[in-house]
Amino acid sequence: MSYNLTDPYEIARYIKEAKKSTPIKAYIEGDLSNCDFTNIEKFNSGDLYILFGESEEILVIIEKNKDKIKNCRIEQDRRKSAIPLLDMLKINARIEPGATIRDKVIIGENAVIMMGAVVNIGAEIGEGTMVDMNAVVGARGKLGKNVHLGAGAVVAGVLEPPSSDPCTIEDNVLIGANAVILEGIKIGKGSVVAAGSIVTTDVPENVVVAGAPAKIIKEVDVKTKDKTKLLDDLRK
């Protein structure tokens, strides 16, 4: 079944209809030689087993063979998850440990996703853009090229409340730490959003905004550009 992931209601339907998954990894010491491992990925040497699969299938094996099991340890990082995580092996970008990126996103060349950052379904991260520590890019949020999304900043998504227009951050924008860009807002090219600002209306190109709600305080000048320049070495 196909879904139009530009529509928040279609995204919600996709999540609703997706098969929910609770994958686990089990380390087992015992005799499981007579078990049926259909649909389970198994690695073993002698009485040592590592099993990857859905919890309901692995837990059945453990319960039925508990008298043959000496030791068991289970690792789990999600429950009834609807959307898988992105296969990062296919991405030519720097993605640090602890970043959470859902499937069906676009990550541009030489982008940087830092520890603790969250990128939700349908989001687009442009070439050379950095999503700093603990920043959030909500569903369908669009970040252009060479954007810096500061630590703890939020680009709101389209899901709750539903919004037909995603947040759009154009090229060469700098968003300071802990700033919040509300649903459907557009930030024009080259603009700067000061740390801690709450942006409730569209921002034109090449201006600096600050405050809650954010207001234009000046145009971007040479001094501003020098203070907010990006470091190419971080994107190599």
Swiss-Prot record:
InterPro entries: DapH, DapH_N, Hexapep, Hexapep_transf_CS, Trans_hexapeptide_repeat, Trimer_LpxA-like_sf. It catalyses: (S)-2,3,4,5-tetrahydrodipicolinate + acetyl-CoA + H2O = L-2-acetamido-6-oxoheptanedioate + CoA. One of its GO terms (biological process) is lysine biosynthetic process via diaminopimelate. It holds the Pfam family DapH_N. GO terms for molecular function: tetrahydrodipicolinate N-acetyltransferase activity. Pathway: Amino-acid biosynthesis; L-lysine biosynthesis via DAP pathway; LL-2,6-diaminopimelate from (S)-tetrahydrodipicolinate (acetylase route): step 1/3. It comes from the Bacteria. The keyword Transferase applies. Keywords: Acyltransferase, Amino-acid biosynthesis, Diaminopimelate biosynthesis, Lysine biosynthesis, Repeat, Transferase. Its EC number is 2.3.1.89. Belongs to the transferase hexapeptide repeat family. DapH subfamily. Catalyzes the transfer of an acetyl group from acetyl-CoA to tetrahydrodipicolinate. This is 2,3,4,5-tetrahydropyridine-2,6-dicarboxylate N-acetyltransferase. It comes from Clostridium botulinum (strain Kyoto / Type A2).
